[in-house]
């Protein structure tokens, strides 16, 4: 077995319909117990394979310098949980089939996938289910959880999926709220960025133009106005990128490659090796692309990027499902400022108490690794010293965070953990 030969693995396809075939790669926990939880991991894009997470800190191995092999990841999330990496929607990574261009359709397909996975592997049916992801997965994860909640009510206890929590890292829930914080993060964060005064001025102007586009989209909603607003949002980043900055880490310049990180380019080299395809049971004619621009474009042109996925959080919380939003505090595009503002704006019965809750230092083994704010089933976490991909930049903190969340949940609200 590849990547982590010490654990049981499964990989292949589950057909969510005759026309849709979703690829997955599953790793049992290194400390497998009957009570081990099951984490389903999704990357975003839209259009990016979950190999980004699997080989980018969340999974049990990382790519070596040549891109042809792997190295063990001692901070893998499967240290204490089963982890399933899913390429979704169709035509992302190794998945293929009829095209999908909306979060809602993708959520329906993923909920169907999970039911079929449990049917195929009933030994995991009692494992608490945690749906997690990063970036544009902030669209997918709440929608999937909401779909599961609805399906569970309809199907009854015997066919219910054991959804316990959701978690999203540096997510894009609502562009309208979060992108307003791009100039602030680029120009006034605790980190020194490449943005000079001219770039900051241009970002502020682009932010004003974005606000105007949002007003037009709200007053005259159509595919055209939604798409125009989406592009106006991304225009805020242009001055920063022209100055050479990475939208995924304000501490860095963009050095090329996916997410301005050459490491991620090696994932495609690894995944396209014939022996990898054979071992994983992948179609030999399916070329692996880490992030599909055609899938991303189809979501943009359908207006999907303007959806506010936080609309599903009150329903999820009401069902007793815990919600964690965590953010590396050096990311720009889905920065912690915008994510915190997003969470403070969620309308649920605990809104006032969550807003009044203190931000407490999160300390592990005597080291401050971030800040945590919690009330009830909702938590927001700022992770120090991490960019867009927390597990890649701060692997030890990432593992400590997810282990505490899975084992205890509310412990994250304490001011000191060791």
Regions found by a protein language model. Give the residues of each.
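Terminal and linker regions of secretory-pathway proteins
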Residues: 1-418
């Amino acid at each position: 077995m590849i990547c982590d030969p010490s654990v049981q693995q499964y990989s292949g396809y589950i057909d969510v319909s005759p026309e849709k075939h979703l690829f997955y790669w599953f790793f049992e926990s290194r400390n497998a117990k009957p009570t081990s939880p099951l984490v389903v991991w999704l990357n975003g894009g839209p259009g990016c394979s979950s190999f980004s997470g699997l080989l980018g800190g969340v999974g049990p191995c990382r790519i070596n310098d040549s891109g042809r092999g792997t190295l063990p990841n001692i901070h893998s999330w499967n240290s204490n949980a089963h982890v399933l990496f899913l390429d979704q929607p169709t035509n992302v990574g190794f998945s293929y089939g009829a095209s999908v261009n909306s979060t809602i359709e993708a959520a329906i397909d993923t909920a169907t996938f999970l039911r079929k996975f449990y049917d195929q592997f009933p030994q995991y049916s009692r494992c608490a289910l945690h749906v997690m992801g990063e970036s544009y997965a902030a669209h997918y994860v709440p929608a999937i959880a909401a779909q599961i909640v609805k399906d569970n009510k309809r199907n009854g206890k015997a066919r219910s999926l054991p959804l316990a929590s959701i978690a999203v890292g540096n997510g894009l829930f609502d562009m309208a709220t979060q992108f307003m914080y791009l100039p602030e993060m680029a120009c006034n964060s605790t980190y020194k960025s490449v943005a000079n005064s001219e770039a900051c001025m241009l970002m502020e102007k682009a932010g004003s133009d974005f606000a105007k586009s949002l007003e037009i989209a709200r007053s005259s909603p159509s595919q055209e106005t939604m798409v125009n607003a989406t592009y106006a949002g991304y225009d805020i980043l242009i001055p920063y990128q022209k100055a050479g900055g990475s939208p995924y880490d304000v501490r860095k310049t963009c050095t090329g490659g996916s997410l301005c990180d050459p490491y991620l380019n090696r994932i495609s080299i690894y995944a396209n090796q014939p022996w990898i395809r054979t071992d994983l049971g992948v179609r030999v004619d399916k070329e692996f692309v880490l992030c599909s621009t055609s899938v991303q474009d189809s979501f943009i042109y359908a207006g999907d990027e303007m959806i506010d996925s936080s609309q599903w959080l009150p329903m999820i919380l009401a069902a007793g499902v815990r919600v964690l939003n965590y953010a590396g505090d050096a990311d720009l595009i889905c920065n912690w400022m915008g994510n915190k503002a997003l969470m403070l704006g969620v309308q649920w019965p605990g809104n006032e108490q969550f807003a009044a809750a203190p931000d407490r230092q999160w300390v592990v083994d005597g080291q401050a690794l971030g800040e945590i704010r919690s009330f009830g089933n909702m938590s927001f976490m700022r992770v120090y010293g991490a960019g867009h991909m927390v597990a890649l930049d701060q692997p030890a903190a990432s593992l400590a965070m997810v282990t505490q969340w899975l084992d205890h949940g509310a412990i994250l609200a304490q001011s000191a953990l060791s």
